[in-house]
Amino acid sequence: SLRKAKDYIENSDFEKAKSIFKNFVKNFPNSTLLPEVFFYLAETYYNSDNWKLAANSYLESFSLDPKGDFAPKALFGLAISLGALKQFDQACLTLEEVVLRFPGQKMVSTENILETKKLLSCY
């Protein structure tokens, strides 16, 4: 179950969580939960330093529901993953998208965005 997969993430058992999320995507390709599932799948890759797959999964989460609850965090995760892949221009543009598309959102703090911009030398 998705609850179990989230528990695995909380306990840093990313391989078990990843397996559940991947099976969910395969078994329920039209589910309305896919934006959430891809977000958490991205988190498993992120926590395993697999930046390319993390970036792809964050992008998939965002693309499936660009105005949804997970969209700001998915874009932010995408920006960090792109930065880790040394795609700094794209990472900085993606951070700007978080600010432009979701002004005043509470999912990603302004402090986190500014800190990440600084780390990526976006100025």
For each of these PLM feature ranges, what is it?
Residues N27-L33, F62-A71, L100-E111, Y123:
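Short solvent-exposed coil/turn linkers within tandem alpha-helical repeat scaffolds
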